[in-house]
Each structure stands twice: as C-alpha cells, then as structure tokens.
Amino acid sequence: MADRAPPPPPPPAGIDSRSGFCAATRIFHSTRAPGDLPPESLPMTAAAYAFSLLSSSTLPGRPALVDAATGIAISYPSFLAAVRSLAGGLWCSLGLRPGDVALVVAPSRLEVPVLDFALMSIGAVVSPANPVSTPEEYAHQVALSRPVVAFAAPEVAAKLPEHVRCVVIGSDEYGRLAASDGRRAAAPAAVAVKQSDTAAVLYSSGTTGRVKAVAITHRNLIALMSLHADNREKVAREAAEAGEEPPPPAVTLLPIPLFHVFGFMMVLRSVSMGETSVLMERFDFIAALRAIERYRVTLLPAAPPVLVAMVKYEEARRRDLSSLLVIGIGGAPLGREVAEQFASVFPNVELVQGYGLTESSGAVAATVGPEESKAYGSVGKLGSHLQAKIVDPSTGYVGDDEATAATVDSEGWLKTGDLCYFNEDGFLYIVDRLKELIKYKGYQVPPAELEHILQSHPGIADAAVIPYPDEEAGELPMAFIVRQPGSNITKEQVMDYVAKQVAPYKKVRRVAFVTAIPKSPAGKILRRELVQQALSMGASKL
C-alpha cells in the first residue's frame, strides 16, 4: 500500500478552518496543504527545478512538444539535448550572463519553449512579447525591460527597434547557436542564480492602458511547478489506494500564445510534469477541434468563449473529443449558465476554473478535483502559500515605478482591481473588473453578468457589454452581439431577453450587431476598441 501523506497542519489560531478567514486581520489564508518547496537559500533556476522533477524512466519516446499544424514532434530526450546545446551557444558564443534580458518575439512554434528553457537555464531573463504588436509597442516594451538581445521570427524582426541586437529564429546565426558542437564549451552545469532573481519579464494585458512589464522570479515559477507536482502525487496516491493505475501524463493543446502568462506557465507546467504540449500558432476553433481528435488531447486551457462555441456549434459534436478529460478555464469569468450547459453536453469533461494575474505569476486560485469543479461561478480556492484581502473599493513593474506604486500598497499587497468575494467555504468568486463597471445613474452594473445572460441565448454566438456615454445617465449598458448562423434576433429581442432576468438599472439600453468581438490573445474582451467603435458609429446607426 502506498504511504499516506501527512494530513495538512491545523490552521493557526484565529483562522477559520473552512474559509481560511482571520477576523482579527481580515485576511483570507489558503486552506490548501503547503507545497514542498526547495529551501529558498538554495541557488536554483526554474529550468533546473523543472528538469529535476522529470522521471527519466518514463521519458524516452514521449513527445515533449508537437506542432498541431504539421504533426512534427520533439521527444523529451531531443528536447533536453536541444536546450543544453542552445544554452551552450547562448553562453559561449553570444556571451549571455545571468540577469541579461532577452526579448523573444515569435508565434507558438517548437523553437520557442527550447529557447525559453535555454535562457532560464543560464540565468538569463526571458521576455516574451506578442508577435503582432506594432513597432511603437515594441519600442515601449524595450524601453521598459531593456533587453540586450532579441530573438525574433523572420516576419517580426523588421518591427523591432534598430538599436537592439536581433537574432532571427531559423537563420544561419541562430542555427550555429543551437548546433551541437563538440568543439564549443558547454554552459556551466549550475549557474549562480538565486531563486529570488528575475527569471522572466512578462507584459501585462493592455486592455485598460499601455502594457506594463512584470518581473517574475525563479521562486515564483518553482512554486507554481511544485504545486502541480504535489497535485500529481496526490492523484497517484489516491489511485494506488483505490487499486487503480495513476492517470497517464496529459496531452495539452495550447491555443493560448506562449507570450501570455497563461501559455507561458502551461508549457512550464507541462515540461516539469513530463507531459506533451501541442502548440497552435494562432487560435482557430475548427483547427482546435481537429487537433483534439488527432492528438488525443486530454487537457485544454481555454477562455470561456471556447466553451460557448463547443456548446453551440454542431462541429464540436461531430468530432471525436472522447479523449478530452479536463478544460482549464481562465482569462475571464465563467458564468454558471454556460458551465451548466457545457456539463450537460460534455458530462465527462471536468471544468477546472482558475483565476490569476500576470503580476501574481499566474494562478491565484483554482478548483481542484471534480467536487470543487461543481462550484460553478467560482474560480476555486486560494493556492498554497497565498493570502488575500477583500477591501472596500509583487516584485513590481519593470521600468515603471508609478504603475508599481499604484498596484502594490505599502504593506506589499497586490491590488488586483477585481470586484470579488469569498464564501463560507473559502471559494473565491470574481464579479468583474472594478475599472469595467458601468456607472448607470449612480448604480454599478457588472458587464460580465450581462454577457453571461446574453451568451445563454440560443440565437447569440457571442456578446460583449460596454459603457456608452450618456448625458443624463452617465453611462448606458450597450451590447455588441454576434448572431448565431441563421439567427435573426433583433435589438428589441436582445433587450427584452436581458430585462426579464435583471433589475431595471441593469437593462441593456443599446444594441449593435457585429461579426466578431475583439479579444486579446488570452480571450479577454477589448472593451476600449468596442467603445471607440460605438462612438464612431454614432447614435443614428445603433
């Protein structure tokens, strides 16, 4: 029989065992068992920690990475060898050293995870950026993170500032760096990198303003991987106690870009767990369904609109998606109605809901296991080692002290800007972004609530709600609607459908029909673009 894990320690005095709330300090504490982290004083990179978790006996032949479009795969032995070889080129030929920032600008191609791990393994700082950004946006990002070199896809290189040294991925120069050359010295087996040193600089979403550069430490990434390793051991232990085999390593489809915190962390997790990542250069719903079927994908990280599409489009039912076991939801709130509709159509797929920020190195809270996943509308419980405060309405940002001061208070608390609450069992519920609340005649209207209602209508494929300026009311809730194919739903029907389900002040007052809702790569609605579109359309055309 497998050894039983020790029970989690009792909560400190004054902390409620169900919710984790301390009435004296008004702080919510994680009720999860603390993870098994290496000593903080031990020099270690995130890459070294990830590789230390791998079991060599199960790796040969298993793909680490697969290109969804071509089917080209890289096995774990080949992946590890490629990382070591490239790390040697970066150290010996390019002269990169710990703390040097390297901008990585490329779509989700097989070379990118190899490059990311090679950079982290020598203590260099990975700074992944969106390959479809403009030259002005790259100039802003470069001014913040100050990279000594940029690695760019051929189609992107010309958009980068001229003063930044650029190595084109796939070029002869890059090939020489990546080549295994017995005459070239290897990178040091262990570099003098503290866990508190910066491992990555990620750029936060620009949905409410100019992007900010967020510093993520090796310790941040190690804690994330440790959490997943602990969960894997728990699942294996429970399977052994039940006389069952533990589940095989996941095959994860990654339609989320690797420059986003969600995609970046998912690849890190996948490698540390010895799993397979199937990469998509850009999200396409039909292509994603084909990839799930072709590669027998078991895990899909996605934003809520993907669930809506899977429920509403017949193509999802025509495909063999029987391998799919888990969908990890992030990027935006998931409404109860959408979750329940999905569960009725795909009863064997577990929905793991989570919540995180770039500034928090990803996950803050998540559901764990089938029972917690039934808490529809919640993003789960606080992760190990985390605390939170609900207040009345990090390492910091790189090169932007003003933004850091506005986001991290004097006691070190990260202000997330979310309207949220905990229930008596410690489940966290995200209502909406404070900055996105619509102010109608003094009332606060959460657009996400109205979007969930609209998306439940069978004639609506997608929806977004924005504030429309009004002299009398201040702001009016305005809905942008994408009709389902064959649907002829009218503006009046849209407004009536919502009005029957909300208080009078939450009614949708304006409606516009569009072919698509603009979204960030992580699936967040780009409300600023819709506001500009609404103003340019003019009242007479609405």
UniProtKB/Swiss-Prot annotation:
Molecular function as annotated in GO: 4-coumarate-CoA ligase activity; ATP binding; CoA-ligase activity; trans-cinnamate-CoA ligase activity
Region listing for SBD1, in residue ranges: 284-353
Superkingdom, taxonomy of origin: Eukaryota
InterPro entries in alphabetical order: AMP-bd_C (IPR025110), AMP-bd_C_sf (IPR045851), AMP-binding_CS (IPR020845), AMP-dep_synth/lig_dom (IPR000873), ANL_N_sf (IPR042099)
Cofactors demanded by this protein: Mg(2+)
Residues that hold ATP according to the record: 204-208, 212, 353-354, 358, 418, 433, 524
Residues annotated as binding CoA: 282, 441-442
Coiled coil, from the record: none
Keyword field contains ATP-binding: yes
One Gene Ontology biological process: phenylpropanoid metabolic process
Region (SBD2): 354-397
Keywords for the protein's UniProt record, in alphabetical order: ATP-binding, Ligase, Magnesium, Nucleotide-binding
Keyword presence, DNA-binding: no
Catalytic activity as recorded in UniProt: (E)-4-coumarate + ATP + CoA = (E)-4-coumaroyl-CoA + AMP + diphosphate; (E)-4-coumarate + ATP + H(+) = (E)-4-coumaroyl-AMP + diphosphate; (E)-4-coumaroyl-AMP + CoA = (E)-4-coumaroyl-CoA + AMP + H(+)
EC numbers, comma separated: 6.2.1.12
Binding, (E)-4-coumaroyl-AMP: 262, 331, 353-354, 358, 435, 439
Function, in words: Carboxylate--CoA ligase that may use 4-coumarate as substrate. Follows a two-step reaction mechanism, wherein the carboxylate substrate first undergoes adenylation by ATP, followed by a thioesterification in the presence of CoA to yield the final CoA thioester.
Family classification: Belongs to the ATP-dependent AMP-binding enzyme family.
Domain notes for this protein: Both substrate-binding domains (SBD1 and SBD2) are involved in the substrate recognition, and are sufficient to confer the substrate specificity.
Protein's UniProt name: 4-coumarate--CoA ligase-like 5
Gene source species: Oryza sativa subsp. japonica (Rice)
Taxonomic path: Eukaryota, Viridiplantae, Streptophyta, Embryophyta, Tracheophyta
Gene: 4CLL5
